[in-house]
């Protein structure tokens, strides 16, 4: 079947009332950005849905795949746009039915948005179903459990007919909910947290704490790859890599061993808080999950949060670990996250970290040294990368160049 349009259904945009135009425009921008590099299509965003007009050479499978990854889209259907006549509808219905397997069942489903169309819903269903039965052998009607469902939408401008409905990612268009800073480690949780807030229309930039030589270049490349996977959904993402060695060593030098984990995370939060204001973000996002590890008890969260007045969003707070793993696999970050390269959260880990840190104690331990200068230096020396869906690390670029030189 050669389709001439893609029908794109909005997710929660129908709930946005007078603000819908803003959301539709943002979604259209996101669609154009996602489809960059492809040709043979025209995007037409309307109030209640979006249509993508396809030329003969358009790669419909690739376009549909990319659309399915965009937040704010509920579903996509390849459709035939036909004239508003029963003859045109009947001809299209026969085209669909010609692809049915022998002895299969079908039904006709009609939605009539144009109430002025001369035939009502039931008349159209009977007429089109009867035409298929007359023209196609060895098929029958089953309105309850049909093998195939020919869907017909009678709209003001034309009639759209389709069978397939491809699920989208749902949620809201990224760019409609403000900007946040994602604390991105190399673990399973934080990429999922980033994906969850993006699903709610939020733009992210990411911050990662790198402690060479204690953390390797492979650990850094792992985080770049996680960012690249997230960027497949939303376009380029800025990744801010913080040189954290100096701060981390000083924490381990002056803070009681049982409190180093708490203090280290407080330093991360102080750095993140400064960056939030620089980039114009409204909140910090992390992958913390209540009660999983010593740093993620309520006592720890209280002690760590105290260094910032910026809202800290924890999308995974109440998830079971298995739920997070399932989501990680669904979004494609799991295999990268489990690569065995240590990040700065796993080095210098005390054998017996305090699970209910006393806030006054951690402040007292940190008071013996003025960390502000080190924090400012870490912020000043941040390395910022813009990660796209086709981003390649320096190592990958060098490898490709060697291959090209060899060939």
From Swiss-Prot:
Its EC number is 2.8.1.4. Its main location: cytoplasm. It is an enzyme of class 2 (transferase). It catalyses: [ThiI sulfur-carrier protein]-S-sulfanyl-L-cysteine + a uridine in tRNA + 2 reduced [2Fe-2S]-[ferredoxin] + ATP + H(+) = [ThiI sulfur-carrier protein]-L-cysteine + a 4-thiouridine in tRNA + 2 oxidized [2Fe-2S]-[ferredoxin] + AMP + diphosphate; [ThiS sulfur-carrier protein]-C-terminal Gly-Gly-AMP + S-sulfanyl-L-cysteinyl-[cysteine desulfurase] + AH2 = [ThiS sulfur-carrier protein]-C-terminal-Gly-aminoethanethioate + L-cysteinyl-[cysteine desulfurase] + A + AMP + 2 H(+). It comes from the Bacteria. Disulfide bonds: none annotated. The keyword Cytoplasm applies. Keywords: ATP-binding, Cytoplasm, Nucleotide-binding, RNA-binding, Thiamine biosynthesis, Transferase, tRNA-binding. Pathway: Cofactor biosynthesis; thiamine diphosphate biosynthesis. GO terms for biological process: thiamine biosynthetic process; thiamine diphosphate biosynthetic process; thiazole biosynthetic process; tRNA 4-thiouridine biosynthesis. GO terms for cellular component: cytosol. InterPro entries: Rossmann-like_a/b/a_fold (IPR014729), ThiI_AANH (IPR020536), ThiI_fer (IPR054173), ThiI_N (IPR049961), THUMP_dom (IPR004114), THUMP_ThiI (IPR049962), tRNA_STrfase (IPR003720), tRNA_sulfurtransferase_ThiI (IPR050102). The keyword Oxidoreductase does not apply. Residues 61-165 form the THUMP domain. SUPFAM superfamilies: Adenine nucleotide alpha hydrolases-like, THUMP domain-like. One of its GO terms (molecular function) is CCA tRNA nucleotidyltransferase activity. It holds the Pfam family ThiI_fer. This is Probable tRNA sulfurtransferase. The gene is thiI.
